[in-house]
Swiss-Prot record:
It is found in: Plastid, Chloroplast stroma. It comes from Arabidopsis thaliana (Mouse-ear cress). This is 1-deoxy-D-xylulose 5-phosphate reductoisomerase, chloroplastic. Its cofactor is Mn(2+); Mg(2+). NCBIfam families: Dxr, PRK12464.1. Belongs to the DXR family.
Length: 477
C-alpha cells in the first residue's frame, strides 16, 4: 500500500520511480519518487463532507470488517478452508481454482457450479473432487454424468438453477466465490447469504441490481461481503483499520480500455475484434467490452456506493493506463492511500478467500512489483464524450432502486448484441440510455427480490427490441 499526502490523481499527471542506486536523489522528496502535476497554482484538497453515511440503528456496510477493530477469530473448520465456487468454468472460477491448486493446505473445494462448459467442469471435478456439482443448463446433465461415469468416488449432481443454489449454500462451505456474470448470480448469492456463508463477490450485479435488497439481508445474517474484483478489493484493503467517518473520497482507477488512445471520431469504425483487445488484462468478452466502453467503471461506481456507503459525488474515476494502482481512497486529513500490484485477478480473489490473513505466494507464479523497473505511473481524467457510460451510470445510481439493475441488464444485452454484430459499438450507449429512459416511470425505489428479477428481464427484452434514433432496430439472427 502507498500513501500520498494531499494529492488528487486527477491533478497529478505522473508519479515517477527512480532507482537511487543509479540516479541522484530527488531534492525535497526522499524515498526515490517525484510528483508532477499541472496547474501548480490551483488549490486542491478541497473540503468534502464525509462520504460515509450509515443509517441510524444499522450496521456499517458489510465490506467494512476489520475497519477499526479486528474481529475475534471465528474459524469453524478443521484443515484447509472449505469453499464453493459458483461459475467455476468462467474467468473468475478458473483463477480461483488455480489458487486452490497452489495452496492445497489452505483451501479445498466442496462444491462447483457451471453454466454449460461440461468438458471443463468434468476436468475440474476429477482434479478437485468436490462433494457436489451443478450445471445450470439442464439439457447437459446427461452429458456431464457420462463424462464422470468412471469417477472413483460418490458425487452428487444437481441440474438447473436449483443445483446452482445448492452449491451456493452447501453446508460445508465457509466462503462462496460468486463468479457468474449477470443477474443469474443474484439468487445463488442470496441463498448463500441466507445460509450464513461469507461471499467472495465477483458478480457485480449482486449489488448493482440487488443492493437495496442484498445489503440488509447480509447485515441480518452477519455475513461478510468481500469484493473479489481488483478495484473494490483495493479499496477494501485501504480501509482496513480506518476509523468510521475518516473516509472522504473513493478514487476508482480505469485502464481506459481498448480505445483509450483512439480519437472520438474513429469510434464509429470500431469492430468487435478491436473492442476485445484489452491492453492490460486477460478477461472474458463481456467484461473486456465493458472496459472499452467504461461501463465496467460506471457499474463499479454503483458497487462502491453500496459496498462502502460513499455518496456518488465522492466517487471519482481516473484513467490510469498502467493498471498498477488498482484504486485509492482519500481520508479526511487529505491523505491518499493506494493499493498497488501487477494486473492479476488472482490477487484480489486470494485476498477474499484468505481475509483477514495474507497467504504467502511463490515469486515464480506471483511476480513481485518492482517500482524502479516500472519507472512511472500516469493519470488523466476520462473523456465524457468518449465514455458516455459514466454519465449514464452516475444518473442511474442517483436514481437508485431498480434503475441500477436496468442499466446493468440493458448494458449486458447491448454488449451481447454488439459481440454478435447485431448493433454497432456506439449503439451500446444508445440502447442503454433508451432503456433507462423508458424505465423512469416504473422505477421502484425499494424493490423486492422478485421486482429486481422482473425488471432485469424487462430491461433485456426492451433493449433487444429498442428502436434506435436512426430508425433501426437490433438485427436478430
Amino acid at each position: 500500500m502507498m500513501t500520498l499526502n494531499s494529492l488528487s490523481p486527477a491533478e497529478s499527471k505522473a508519479i515517477s520511480f527512480l532507482d537511487t542506486s543509479r540516479f541522484n536523489p530527488i531534492p525535497k522528496l526522499s524515498g526515490g519518487f517525484s510528483l508532477r502535476r499541472r496547474n501548480q497554482g490551483r488549490g486542491f484538497g478541497k473540503g468534502v463532507k464525509c462520504s460515509v453515511k450509515v443509517q441510524q440503528q444499522q450496521q456499517p456496510p458489510p465490506a467494512w470488517p476489520g475497519r477499526a477493530v479486528p474481529e475475534a477469530p471465528r474459524q469453524s473448520w478443521d484443515g484447509p478452508k472449505p469453499i464453493s465456487i459458483v461459475g467455476s468454468t468462467g474467468s473468475i472460477g478458473t483463477q480461483t481454482l488455480d489458487i486452490v491448486a497452489e495452496n492445497p493446505d489452505k483451501f479445498r473445494v466442496v462444491a462447483l457450479a457451471a453454466g454449460s462448459n461440461v468438458t471443463l467442469l468434468a476436468d475440474q471435478v476429477r482434479r478437485f473432487k468436490p462433494a457436489l456439482v451443478a450445471v445450470r443448463n439442464e439439457s447437459l446433465i446427461n452429458e456431464l454424468k457420462e463424462a464422470l461415469a468412471d469417477l472413483d468416488y460418490k458425487l452428487e449432481i444437481i441440474p438447473g438453477e436449483q443445483g446452482v443454489i445448492e452449491v451456493a449454500r452447501h453446508p460445508e462451505a465457509v466462503t462462496v466465490v460468486t463468479g457468474i456474470v449477470g443477474c443469474a448470480g443474484l439468487k445463488p448469492t442470496v441463498a448463500a447469504i441466507e445460509a450464513g456463508k461469507d461471499i467472495a463477490l465477483a458478480n457485480k450485479e449482486t449489488l448493482i441490481a440487488g443492493g437495496p435488497f442484498v445489503l440488509p439481508l447480509a447485515n441480518k445474517h452477519n455475513v461478510k461481503i468481500l469484493p473479489a474484483d481488483s478495484e473494490h478489493s483495493a479499496i477494501f484493503q485501504c480501509i482496513q483499520g480506518l476509523p468510521e467517518g475518516a473516509l472522504r473520497k473513493i478514487i476508482l482507477t480505469a485502464s481506459g480500455g481498448a480505445f483509450r488512445d483512439w480519437p472520438v471520431e474513429k469510434l464509429k469504425e470500431v469492430k468487435v475484434a478491436d473492442a476485445l483487445k484489452h491492453p492490460n488484462w486477460n478477461m472474458g468478452k463481456k467484461i473486456t467490452v465493458d472496459s472499452a466502453t467504461l461501463f465496467n467503471k460506471g457499474l463499479e461506481v454503483i458497487e462502491a456506493h453500496y459496498l462502502f456507503g460513499a455518496e456518488y459525488d465522492d466517487i471519482e474515476i481516473v484513467i490510469h493506463p498502467q493498471s498498477i494502482i488498482h484504486s485509492m481512497i482519500e481520508t479526511q486529513d487529505s491523505s491518499v492511500l493506494a493499493q498497488l500490484g501487477w494486473p492479476d485477478m488472482r490477487l484480489p480473489i486470494l485476498y477474499t478467500m484468505s481475509w483477514p490473513d495474507r497467504v504467502p505466494c511463490s515469486e515464480v507464479t506471483w511476480p513481485r512489483l518492482d517500482l524502479c523497473k516500472l519507472g512511472s505511473l500516469t493519470f488523466k481524467k476520462p473523456d465524457n464524450v468518449k465514455y458516455p457510460s459514466m454519465d449514464l451510470a452516475y444518473a442511474a445510481g442517483r436514481a437508485g432502486g431498480t434503475m441500477t439493475g436496468v442499466l446493468s441488464a440493458a448494458n449486458e444485452k447491448a454488449v451481447e448484441m454488439f459481440i454478435d454484430e447485431k448493433i454497432s459499438y456506439l449503439d451500446i450507449f444508445k440502447v442503454v440510455e433508451l432503456t433507462c429512459d423508458k424505465h423512469r416511470n416504473e422505477l421502484v425505489t425499494s424493490p423486492s427480490l422478485e421486482e429486481i428479477v422482473h425488471y432485469d428481464l424487462w430491461a433485456r427484452e426492451y433493449a433487444a427490441n429498442v428502436q434506435l434514433s436512426s430508425g433501426a432496430r437490433p438485427v436478430h439472427a
